[in-house]
Amino acid sequence: TGKKYQNFKAVASLYPEACQIVVRKDSDIETIDDLQGKKVSVGEEESGSELNARQILEMSGLPEDLIKTKHLDYTDAADKLAAGKIDAFFFTAGAQTTVVEELAKHCDIRLLNLDDKLRGKLTTAYPFYSDYTIPAGTYTGQEEDIQTVCVQSILVASDALDNATVKKLTKTIFAHQKGLQYATSVDLQLNESSAI
């Protein structure tokens, strides 16, 4: 969003959040360029999804004014895609997001791949992106791996929180990560080196 947040510190990198673009399976949209003239949700205003969508569009060379953008959270976007009221939606979240899995169970969907060139541009221009593969079978009906980019979900704390408490918190998270993973369905990727 371009805003600077002060009085916070990064504690640990938790898990990758994949940049995902969902379309109906019967759609003629195969690439980012095919979004031209389409109704596309880029995420809620000032959300991480919106920021990622804008960066992806910028690096793809497709001017955003050539797309009929909507600002929907991904629950509303999934409902509107199923109803045929939008053509695609961007969202950034851990792979196998429940909302998309539920959508896939009653509406045939596809995820768009980001080609090598676009992923290279993104990771060069914005070093917080990494290449990411959403494995086949992550969502119902997904028959192939999807190549995209991801950002890391970061645990932050107030600068006022003392280091001893931060250390205790991270130790607890690392000790109970299997339970956290089960409770959240998120692919936590914690290790001692991810603590910041």
Regions found by a protein language model. Give the residues of each.
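Bilobed "Venus flytrap"/periplasmic-binding protein-like clamshell domains
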Residues: P16-A83
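Segments of small-molecule ligand-sensing domains
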Residues: T138-I196
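Pocket-lining segment of extracytoplasmic ligand-binding domains
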Residues: S27, P63-I154, L161
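Extracytoplasmic
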Residues: Y5-F8, P16-A18, G37, H106-I109, ...
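A structural signal for short loop-to-beta-strand junctions that line the ligand-binding cleft
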Residues: K4-L14, T138-I146
